[in-house]
Amino acid sequence: MLSFSIITCTWNSEPFIARCIESVASQTYPQIEHVFVDGGSEDGTLERIKRTPGNIKYVTDVRGGISNAMNVGVELSSGDVIAHLHGDDYYLHDQVIARVAGVFDSSNAQWLYGRIVSDLAGEQFKPDWQLPEFSLSRLLRGNFIAHPAAFVRREAFLRSGGFDCGLKYAMDYDLWLRLAKISPPVGLDEYFSAFRRHAGSASTANAFAAFEEDHSVRRRHRPAGLVPQLFHEAIYQYRRARLGQLPRMR
């Protein structure tokens, strides 16, 4: 039976951490460890983590940014399959890990992903787009793989080199592109997780910086040649113009 490590990075996550913990603890699949990497919380986050039932590990005062924290979590973990579920996110039902384990058991997949809903002030919203069929060229046009709904075999994660600590926002996108060059993933058009959108979340509070870093990652991985360069630059300019028209979350 495959074992799973769910890695949760936290920093002053008290308003949301209980829901995250409960969603992991409620999973019916038996072989799960929950690994917490805390960046030095000064609220009640650590106290809540220490009360977590089941198989847990935690480390505190981890510095160096979110990419480093996620890599530290992998080093601390022992599961055959790795997933990251941040302290303000949560699984949608108690069969998520059982479903994922079944897909791994019945395929040669090295990694897989499902879908997420957005949680805005407690209300859940499903995306208004269809999950595309996976291809590396499609992924290079834009990241459609949601980190809270992605699961990676340990061997594949280590072979990929882990998260780039030089990235603050697009470290997951960069990892997907490197993993895709090792092995294509299995994509499941099923909802696994909820991603909370609030002013304190890094990707929400710094949407423009995250967008620019996404583009830098895309340039890093795109094919050589003038045509790919012009194609991706055109996509970048179009999306940048659209992003400038969106209201900011306050």
Question: What do the PLM-derived regions correspond to, one by one?
Answer:
Residues M1-A207:
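Nucleotide-sugar donor-binding/catalytic module of glycosyltransferases
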